[in-house]
Amino acid sequence: MQIIVNDTSCLIDLRKAGLLHAALLLPFAFQIALPLLRTALLEFTRAEIEDLIARGLAVIDLPPDSVGRAITFRSAYPALSINDCFSMALAESQPGCILLTADQNLKNKATSIGIEVHGVLWVSDQLESSGHTTYEHSMAAYAS
């Protein structure tokens, strides 16, 4: 199963659109780096986080070499937040995975090192093509 590494912006956007639970039904293994869960998802309640984990969101504790890589990214790309760098390091450590982000700086840097990157609209397309939602439902969700 292909892995999708999430940054927080896409999880928040999918939640606001009411599509986060449906996204976790897609045939991908969804992951988030542990530091993001502890710092950037503060607008999610503990119960919401536990529910997402129960639905299949894997929280990955980065090994020391990935933490080191994130710090290297942070030094090389000061426009990226440390959380962006954790996401990029996690994605880089798993060849063939997808990085899901809405952050243009992160998209550009990740693409430049060979990571496949998509955003929320790609998830909407996946939901529609898999029958988990319709185009009309997705557009109504984003309009609200």
Predicted features and spans:
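Glycine-rich phosphate-binding "P-loop"
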Residues: 67-78
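Short hydrophobic alpha-helical runs that function as membrane-insertion/retention elements
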Residues: 98-101, 118-119
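Non-catalytic interface/targeting segments
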Residues: 4, 9, 14, 63-64, ...
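Acidic, PIN/NYN-like endoribonuclease modules and their adjacent C-terminal/linker elements
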Residues: 34, 46-48, 107-144
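Short His-Asn-centered micro-motif
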Residues: 6-9, 34, 101-103
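Acidic, metal-associated active-site segment
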Residues: 81-98, 105-106, 141-144
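Short active-site oxyanion
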Residues: 1-3, 28-30, 93-98
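PIN/NYN-family metal-dependent endoribonuclease catalytic core
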Residues: 5, 14-66, 122
